[in-house]
């Protein structure tokens, strides 16, 4: 106890303000320095980014764009035909007949 009583050092208000200012100024700088050095080793997560070969490739050339549009139209047509077939099988509806009914109803509403 006597050892600590002999060592009485009190901080003045100016010293505390200087410490606070320097801490507030240097702490973010120290964190940024720590994070900024060797980021490949510290923050590297293997397998985080997907392999570029597995990503969708955006067509850039005109022939690639046309081929992609043709593929999309083909998929959409196949899906539509599949759904029409499913409707005909499950509900027994004739789609052409239903389309004609809708056209007649719309013509009656207009006229």
Swiss-Prot record:
Membrane protein topology class: Single-pass membrane protein
GO molecular function annotations of the record: unfolded protein binding
Record keywords, A-Z: Membrane, Mitochondrion, Transit peptide, Transmembrane, Transmembrane helix
Record InterPro entries: Pet100
One GO BP: mitochondrial cytochrome c oxidase assembly
Transmembrane segments: 18-36
GO CC terms in record: mitochondrial inner membrane; mitochondrion
Predominant subcellular localization, coarse grouping: mitochondrion
Entry's family note: Belongs to the PET100 family.
Note: Present with 468 molecules/cell in log phase SD medium.
PANTHER family per the UniProt record, alphabetical: PROTEIN PET100 HOMOLOG, MITOCHONDRIAL
Biological function: Required for the biogenesis of cytochrome c oxidase. Probably for its assembly into an active holoenzyme.
Name this protein carries in UniProt: Protein PET100, mitochondrial
Organism expressing this protein natively: Saccharomyces cerevisiae (strain ATCC 204508 / S288c)
Gene: PET100
């Amino acid at each position: 106890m006597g050892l600590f009583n002999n060592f009485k050092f009190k901080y003045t208000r100016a010293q505390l303000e200087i410490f606070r200012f320097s801490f507030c100024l240097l702490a973010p700088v120290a964190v940024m320095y720590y994070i900024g050095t060797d980021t490949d080793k510290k923050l590297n997560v293997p397998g985080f980014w997907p392999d570029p070969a597995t990503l969708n490739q955006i067509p850039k050339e005109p022939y690639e764009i046309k081929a992609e549009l043709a593929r999309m139209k083909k998929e959409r047509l196949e899906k539509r035909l599949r759904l029409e077939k499913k409707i005909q099988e499950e509900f027994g509806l004739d789609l052409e007949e239903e389309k004609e009914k809708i056209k007649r109803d719309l013509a009656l509403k207009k006229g």
